[in-house]
């Protein structure tokens, strides 16, 4: 799916996010989505991370009320908390960010005890305290929140403006950087260089080979690394197709 982003003035962002929600929640899955925008990619990307975060706009309003007395402190932390959201799956990057965030012991206690910040959605991997701080940052950020619960990303690459939500691989391209006739070529290269993209392609090939039984792209398939796949190919030899 190719989404031309924010076509309807100031209200376009909300409508685009609602349309993206339809894409990622569709059954059977739509596996690839390119967002083509004249907006700054990081703004679009952060709005997506805010919108797809398992909590609703009303729940984020409750969080704002609960932490209103800490607003001045948290407002200063928001840039770090947004960076934490972008790098949540990178242990090295998030560790550096957390060093400054976790210096406030009283805030740690409050984040740990707040039911909305610790709410775990069925089927989502819990990130514990990390997830609580990500949600706290979203609550105090200016980015758009969803009216209804939306799934969290299962993988994020902020440097490439790429993420995976509900087994849909999404990437953001800026219109000033990439011509319309280059989209397919650039996206194809990006999938090839993106580990989870390779697994998406494998899943599509598996579905083509075995059309009965629905989609084969699930969290188990996406968690397999290219290195592990290569190892099993080497060990299985001619029987690799049967192994797959």
Predicted regions located by residue number:
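Extended charged low-complexity segments that act as oligomerization/scaffolding linkers
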Residues: 2-228, 232, 238-239
